[in-house]
């Protein structure tokens, strides 16, 4: 079981170190190797996704990533920016399915901006298609027309791309509460009418899963109004980008939220949903729990080790129940700890 570890920038090295400690404590035979991605890779090689990293990532079964980016590199040409490294590895490894859970732990109910009764017990999984849609469609650009500039992008999805993400979503729903909500904008976009048609066709293969449909504007509203109506949601790249960020804030701390990006054989890139937080880098105060929970997703989706994944997730729950908190989730009456102490607490709970 080969894991390519990419600590990345900012708080990335601090939080991945704790996830690696957790994985090593499970007595499984992991081979782990570190490489550069993002700003650190630009500084060392001039390339945000260097060749050595590409080789390592392709040879690994899974990739564990900290975070990339920071204001230090904002003035670089676009192709040299750290974020290009992340887009590059996703494309290189054909990672088309992004899974982002939004779970509200009972101990953190007060962290949400919504009333506790609206979010208590929240457990949503948002599945976003990662490689198609308006982000990658051609033609795109800005041109001169009738004496003014005109910007244009192309929203495009093929039937096979929709089928591929649809199967991932239905199979995920089968393992949960067997409810899938597909989000589109079929009333104005032909591209997403096709999306809905294909989802309905696929649903015949999964008679045990209840499929519903929702327009994206209503879905954005319902996520705030009554989020617990959702179990698994599936949508395209742009809508998924927006809705998964919205759902993450229902929980009150993005420092708690893991994510997985998978290919068609369940090889995956696992990373926290938060950024590189350069303002707190090196201070030992970052929350490592999203990265530790990302490692649990790796155990589940790439290695099929459900029991071990649950062990890690239950250890995180136990640590929260014991009152341990990093600064981002701290409230009066709890025990404020740093990055390594939080890692220690999870190891003790394991």
From Swiss-Prot:
**Positions contributing to NAD(+) binding:** 70-83, 275-287
Give the co-factor note.
Binds 1 Mg(2+) or Mn(2+) ion per subunit.
Its recorded reaction(s) are: (2R,3S)-3-isopropylmalate + NAD(+) = 4-methyl-2-oxopentanoate + CO2 + NADH
Q: Which InterPro entries match?
A: IsoCit/isopropylmalate_DH_CS, IsoPropMal-DH-like_dom, Isopropylmalate_DH
Per its UniProt record, the required cofactor names are: Mg(2+); Mn(2+)
* Record's signal peptide: none
Which terms are listed as keywords in the entry? Amino-acid biosynthesis, Branched-chain amino acid biosynthesis, Cytoplasm, Leucine biosynthesis, Magnesium, Manganese, Metal-binding, NAD, Oxidoreductase
Q: Which GO terms describe its biological process?
A: L-leucine biosynthetic process
EC class of this enzyme?
Answer: oxidoreductase
Indicate where this protein is primarily found.
cytoplasm
Positions binding substrate in this chain are: 90, 100, 128, 217
Localization terms from the record: Cytoplasm
One of the entry's Gene Ontology molecular-function terms is: 3-isopropylmalate dehydrogenase activity
Question: What would be one Gene Ontology cellular-component term for the protein?
Answer: cytosol
User: Which E.C. number(s) belong to this protein?
Assistant: 1.1.1.85
Q: In which pathway does it act?
A: Amino-acid biosynthesis; L-leucine biosynthesis; L-leucine from 3-methyl-2-oxobutanoate: step 3/4
Q: Which family does it belong to?
A: Belongs to the isocitrate and isopropylmalate dehydrogenases family. LeuB type 1 subfamily.
Q: How does it assemble?
A: Homodimer.
Outline what the protein does.
Catalyzes the oxidation of 3-carboxy-2-hydroxy-4-methylpentanoate (3-isopropylmalate) to 3-carboxy-4-methyl-2-oxopentanoate. The product decarboxylates to 4-methyl-2 oxopentanoate.
| Protein name as catalogued | 3-isopropylmalate dehydrogenase 1
- Organism equals Dechloromonas aromatica (strain RCB)
């Amino acid at each position: 079981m080969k894991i390519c570890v990419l600590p990345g920038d900012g708080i990335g090295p601090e939080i991945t170190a704790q996830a690696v400690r957790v994985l090593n404590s499970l007595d499984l035979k992991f081979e782990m190797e570190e490489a550069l991605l993002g700003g650190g890779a630009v500084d060392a090689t001039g390339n945000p996704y260097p060749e050595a990293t590409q080789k390592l990532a392709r040879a690994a079964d899974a990739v564990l990533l900290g975070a990339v980016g920071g204001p230090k590199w904002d003035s670089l040409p676009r192709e040299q920016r750290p974020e290009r490294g992340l887009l590059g590895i996703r494309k290189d490894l054909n990672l088309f399915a992004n899974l982002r859970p939004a779970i509200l732990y009972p101990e953190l109910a007060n962290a949400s901006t919504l009333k506790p009764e609206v979010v208590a017990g929240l457990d949503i999984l948002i599945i976003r298609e990662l490689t198609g849609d308006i982000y990658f469609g051609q033609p795109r650009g800005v041109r001169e027309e009738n004496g003014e500039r005109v910007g244009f992008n192309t929203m495009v999805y093929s039937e096979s791309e929709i089928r591929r993400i649809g199967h991932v979503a239905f199979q995920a729903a089968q393992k949960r509460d067997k409810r899938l909500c597909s989000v589109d904008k079929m009333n104005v976009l032909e591209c997403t009418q096709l999306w809905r048609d294909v989802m309905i066709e696929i649903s015949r293969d999964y008679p045990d899963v209840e499929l519903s449909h929702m327009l994206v504007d209503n879905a954005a509203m319902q996520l705030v109004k009554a989020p617990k109506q959702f179990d698994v949601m599936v949508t395209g790249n742009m809508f998924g980008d927006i809705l998964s960020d919205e759902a993450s804030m229902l929980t009150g701390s993005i420092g708690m939220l893991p994510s997985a990006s998978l290919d068609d054989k369940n090889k995956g890139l696992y990373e926290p949903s938060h950024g590189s937080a350069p303002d707190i880098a090196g201070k030992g105060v970052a929350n490592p729990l999203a990265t530790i929970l990302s490692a649990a997703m790796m155990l589940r989706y790439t290695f099929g080790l459900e029991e071990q994944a649950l062990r890690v997730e239950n250890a995180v729950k136990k640590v929260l129940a014991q009152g341990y908190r990093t600064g981002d989730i701290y409230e009066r009456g709890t025990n404020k700890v740093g990055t390594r102490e939080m890692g220690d607490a999870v190891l003790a709970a394991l």
